[in-house]
Amino acid sequence: MRNYFAKSLYKKIKKNRNIVLLSADIGNRLFDKIKKDFPKNFLNCGIAEPNMITFATGMAKESFLPICYTITNFLIYKSIEQIRNDAIYNKNKIILVGTGSGMSYNHLGPTHHSVED
């Protein structure tokens, strides 16, 4: 599914250069083709998920369509305040894409589990 997402996103960015993928230090090799062909459309925000959401809302205000991609539990649980206050309350259009729901990242320990999603 991740490979399909990356291929589909590549096609979308090719048609619409206002789409920007923000990653929280995950999936870097998955998006090599995007980084190579559209370097301005990929941003690795590091392990700073709340900052990624705030950055994305700023981009949305400037007519970009940011897509935030990271492990589900970090995307939601670490960033809930920014999602609510920056994106939802201010009606900023951002897209959240979580990967590794449930116990998909079981080998990384309980901090990476997302059993409440």
Regions found by a protein language model. Give the residues of each.
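Thiamine diphosphate
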Residues: 1-117
